Amino acid sequence: MTIAIGKSSEEPKGLFDSMDDWLRRDRFVFVGWSGLLLFPCAYFALGGWFTGTTFVTSWYTHGLASSYLEGCNFLTAAVSTPANSLAHSLLLLWGPEAQGDFTRWCQLGGLWTFVALHGAFGLIGFMLRQFELARSVQLRPYNAIAFSGPIAVFVSVFLIYPLGQSGWFFAPSFGVAAIFRFILFFQGFHNWTLNPFHMMGVAGVLGAALLCAIHGATVENTLFEDGDGANTFRAFNPTQSEETYSMVTANRFWSQIFGVAFSNKRWLHFFMLFVPVTGLWMSAIGVVGLALNLRAYDFVSQEIRAAEDPEFETFYTKNILLNEGIRAWMAAQDQPHENLVFPEEVLPRGNAL
């Protein structure tokens, strides 16, 4: 037996190397350097949302009840945006508005900026987590690239849009019914459904759902029968080394259905990645345009003709009138601080009123 005497040739690890070893260690839930951003931000964003929807009123910012404590349910509770008078203030707890008073900070809408900013950085941390893990196991980074779509939509809707308007007040509040109100607002004040970027977004998301359904059904239909099990998967073995389904059979089937079909898996799966991510990015670009109050597809000639000819009406002119109704009814309720009062004769009336 040989005994080595003397100092180890290994250099002592520095702080960075020690942290790197601990953060990137193989464990049940990977932490990583991205976790230093993801986990605290996700914790604070979710904690702020649960706190706000449970306890905090929107009486001082919107004149509304918005918490479980006030009688709201899961669909009507929300963390509401700050008052319009606070413009684009970050509403820091220690800032000049709240001056360290937590109750006052909640009343002013401080939880909304808290949730929005921590939520944005939490999403970015999640994307970085996918980059980091992909690099660790030597994968391509397409998962992270795909997740840039939801991040772009979140940042454009919750941060860039209100930055282009007069304040955070015009961003969506964090709640189900609150988001519905925001959608109605977008339609009435921006004619959003006729915006080509919205159209591309809808085509991307619904097209992706269609592709996902077709792809899943096709794979199920062409699974190799490799056992005597009774269910769809037969005796499918999760560790089998051979191919699970027949691409050749799938190609023949869709060639007969449509006349064209994907001939290789790489192009097929890239297309399934490209369609929804591009749709989400187009929507985000469109919302940035709305932040600047850009308009799209105003068919003025139809509006003029409809105004001159009582018998001429299109679905477009009908929608324009509906948008005017949304604005007239919504503005006074939605922006109580403006003290808007519309004469009775200008408010649109349905047949039942």
Swiss-Prot record:
Residues the record lists as binding Fe cation: H215, H269
Domain of life: Eukaryota
Enzyme class of the recorded protein, top EC level: oxidoreductase
Positions bound to pheophytin a: Q130, N143
Positions of transmembrane segments: 41-61, 125-141, 153-166, 208-228, 279-295
Residue sites binding a plastoquinone per the record: H215, F262
Membrane topology: Multi-pass membrane protein
Catalytic activity field: 2 a plastoquinone + 4 hnu + 2 H2O = 2 a plastoquinol + O2
Family of the protein in this entry: Belongs to the reaction center PufL/M/PsbA/D family.
Quaternary organization: PSII is composed of 1 copy each of membrane proteins PsbA, PsbB, PsbC, PsbD, PsbE, PsbF, PsbH, PsbI, PsbJ, PsbK, PsbL, PsbM, PsbT, PsbX, PsbY, PsbZ, Psb30/Ycf12, at least 3 peripheral proteins of the oxygen-evolving complex and a large number of cofactors. It forms dimeric complexes.
UniProt miscellaneous comment: 2 of the reaction center chlorophylls (ChlD1 and ChlD2) are entirely coordinated by water.
Stated name of the protein: Photosystem II D2 protein
